[in-house]
């Protein structure tokens, strides 16, 4: 199994350093690693500042990240609880992402997302969701699902869930 195991990691995901484009591949598969090295030497050249920032991130103690992790866990739990309380909505609890995929009681989430932006508002507010079909490689998957990021403050997430609940009660497929 060792020759078939590949670990891929990046500082952009691990340390929320979007755009840094620095990562690693670890495997005992020598052929894979040789091919990866050829590709890396021919095509990749991360900016110097990203390299310096990445090295600093690797040396940062875990305690620095604990507060942020706690905040995102709280946001996640708030969003999931709110979505689970909406009739017809199904959602799995993410374990490491800053977003969730929610199945909605709609036929086409793309149409619903567009309707939210063009035709729905409560007190001049609406909510924006990303149709999930674009995140699947299999055509037809995720048609009634949306991706919702929990990068907002907890209070804003609560309001967004209430808006989504109201929108679903008004929406006609």
Regions from the PLM with identified roles:
Residues 1-173:
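PLP-dependent class I/II
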């Amino acid at each position: 199994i060792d020759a078939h195991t590949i670990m891929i990691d990046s500082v952009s995901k691990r340390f929320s350093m979007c755009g840094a484009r620095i990562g690693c591949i670890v495997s005992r598969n020598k052929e894979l690693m040789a091919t990866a090295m050829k590709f890396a030497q021919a095509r990749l050249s991360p900016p110097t500042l990203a390299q310096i920032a990445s090295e600093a991130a690797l040396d940062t103690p875990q305690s620095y990240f604990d507060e942020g992790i706690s905040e995102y866990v709280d946001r996640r739990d708030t969003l999931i609880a709110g979505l689970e309380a909406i009739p017809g909505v199904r959602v799995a609890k993410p374990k490491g992402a800053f977003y969730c995929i929610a199945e909605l009681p709609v036929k086409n989430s793309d149409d619903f997302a567009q309707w939210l932006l063009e035709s729905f508002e409560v007190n001049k507010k609406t909510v924006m969701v990303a149709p999930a079909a674009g995140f699947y490689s299999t055509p037809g998957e995720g048609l009634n699902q949306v991706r919702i990021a929990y990068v907002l403050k907890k209070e804003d997430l609560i309001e967004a869930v209430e808006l989504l609940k109201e929108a679903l009660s008004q929406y006609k497929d």
